[in-house]
Amino acid sequence: MTGRNDWPSQLAGPKSVNKSFFYPSVGGSVVLSELMPNLNKDYLSYMKVRGSWASVGNPFSRYAANPHFPWIANDGRWSQLTDYPMYDLKPERTNSWELGLSMRFLKNFNLDVTYYSAKTMNQTFNPDLPVSGFSKIYIQTGAVRNSGVELSLGYNNTWNGFTWDTGFTFSTNKNKILTLANDAIN
């Protein structure tokens, strides 16, 4: 179990509403084969189930909530603000969970299966604005779900000093856009 609170400089503007973000995680596993004393080790020598959940944050780009006016030395002036300042931006947030199973069986085989799912929200981008005095505005929209399965099957054996170790893997991943701002497709 973990917990962390970040105070990144991107959120530190004088008018920023969200100056920090907290993200926790928790994970656990149980070795089921240790809980079964009568287990025939020739058939199933090891079995573990595991699970975890985490929520992580990622700040948006610099100066989105804390506008700056760089000095243009060769012109001897401050630059104009071209991005509309936003003060209530939230960090990008990803909530994810994972379930897995690890096994060793028939003396020489091993299997590992994992299912995962992650949802990312508050994705920040800055589309062009129509004529308004500003050229861009930061908006937070968009949610994406990323989920999939990972599977590996292995075999290991030794005969008279010769070792054979092989493995096969399979994975599938699906990304789905859950929400987008209206007319935000490029």
Regions found by a protein language model. Name each.
Residues M1-N186:
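Extracellular/periplasmic, surface-exposed regions of secreted and cell-surface proteins
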